[in-house]
A protein has these predicted regions:
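Midchain, well-structured core segments that form catalytic/ion-binding scaffolds
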Residues: 158-288, 292-300
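Acidic/His- and Gly-rich active-site-bordering loop/insert found
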Residues: 1-105, 125-132
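Short, low-order "capping/linker" segments at domain edges
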Residues: 304-318
């Protein structure tokens, strides 16, 4: 590939667009123009201010399911806020190269991956203009935010047409110390909970007339924090619950509060369903507190791509480019892979999904950056994955 400068320039162009979630700021228009020039059919599934680009080339994915392989590249154009610009060494939305590093918000998460994917597919199509199967892109501007009207919404539209990829590479920054040293083959599930514990408000000098919800909640929350949920399994570490916020009291030192609210999150593996965890958590709380109510929000269930065609193609492509034996990992936070893997939610349409991208040491931080020398190798890895899966 001789596209290093082009990959760099595209990454810079994307960084310049201030696409703070859920804004796209023209990123998908730029990407769409490039894909259409390669013969891709493109369509927007926009909703509630969120931009979702769908593009495909090759066999019509609506009529070729189960006939020929379909490889989808997925990612997001939105970024998290930069924070105070004065805390950055250079303006966060003015791409700047220093000491071999490209700085800017979204450099690692994940505009460099998007640029590498585009140029990987450019090289692939130039070499294989009549390639078998289907190659596609699904790009959203709602991954860093609520993630309601982004990939999840687009998948609903595609599934209704009978479209489902066989394989998906998500360009999340998976690498730890060296490009390609870690590939995410799954992610833990994420379940958010809010428990409200009622008491009786009153004067602290009259304990017989009050019920202090802080006192009531303390042993319940302690039991929740001490609970051992599981021992993990071959793919996942043990599930972990963290209490993130507690709210109670009026601010006065002589008033017993009338209620306490506690927010918590559990990152869980495939040893549990979210329904099982909800029941277990409520039982633990109710062992100590009778008057407790719960509000639940499932960010996503766990997903796992076991060793198969996709993981083998990815590991071999990394090995060819870097000589590294990539670790298959399920660590880290949630991503849109949680929507792509189950696809239509029927349990019958699972997609093989991995996450592979830049080094993640600076994501969401001040002075986010990516190694310039990693851009071209990442594009070659993506291209080799496509060749392995589509050129049979």
């Amino acid at each position: 590939m001789e596209n290093e400068s082009s990959i760099l320039e595209l990454t810079k162009a994307l960084i310049r667009r201030v696409s703070v979630t859920p804004e796209d700021a023209g990123c998908q228009e730029l990407i769409g123009d490039m894909l259409r020039a390669l013969g891709f059919t493109t369509e927007q599934f926009n909703a509630h201010g969120v931009h979702n680009l769908w593009a495909w080339r090759g066999l019509d994915p609506a009529s070729s399911a189960d006939i020929a392989p379909h490889l989808m590249f997925a990612g997001h154009t939105d970024v998290v806020p930069s924070g105070p610009p004065e805390n950055w060494q250079s303006p966060p939305f003015e791409p700047t190269i220093r000491d071999g590093l490209l700085y800017g918000r979204g450099a690692a998460d994940m505009k460099s991956s998007l640029a590498a994917m585009i140029y990987a597919v450019t090289a692939f199509v130039e070499e294989n203009p009549d390639h078998p199967g289907t190659i596609s892109f699904l790009i959203t501007s709602d991954e860093e935010g609520e993630a309601i009207h982004g990939t999840r919404h687009a998948i609903t539209q595609l599934a209704q047409r009978g479209i489902k990829p066989d394989f998906c590479v998500v360009g999340e920054p998976s690498s730890s110390h060296h490009l390609g040293d870690v590939v995410r083959c799954g992610r833990r599930g994420s379940l958010n909970g809010l428990v409200t514990i009622k008491g009786v408000q009153g004067h602290v000098a009259y304990p017989e007339m009050v019920t202090n919800p802080i006192h009531t909640a303390a042993p319940a929350l302690d039991a929740l924090a001490r609970e051992i949920w599981d021992d993990g399994n071959a793919y996942y570490p043990p599930s972990s619950l963290q209490i993130s916020n507690i709210q109670s009291g009026t601010g006065a030192t002589n008033v017993v509060p009338g209620e306490l609210k506690a927010w918590f999150n559990i990152r869980f593996n495939t040893e549990h369903s979210d329904a099982e965890l909800r029941q277990r958590i409520e039982e633990i709380i109710h062992q100590h507190v009778l008057d407790a109510t719960f509000v639940w929000q499932l960010s996503g269930p766990p997903f796992l791509t076991e060793t198969g065609a996709l993981t083998q193609a990815v590991q071999e492509a990394i090995r060819q480019e870097t000589s590294l034996d990539a670790e298959l990992s399920t660590s880290g936070g949630t991503s849109d892979g949680r929507f792509i893997s189950p696809w239509d939610g029927s349990g019958q349409a699972k997609v093989e999904v991995v996450e592979l991208g830049s080094i993640n040491a600076t994501i969401h931080k001040v002075d986010e950056c990516v190694r310039v020398d990693d851009l071209e190798p990442l594009a070659r890895i993506y291209r080799n994955i496509a060749e392995s899966l589509l050129i049979i």
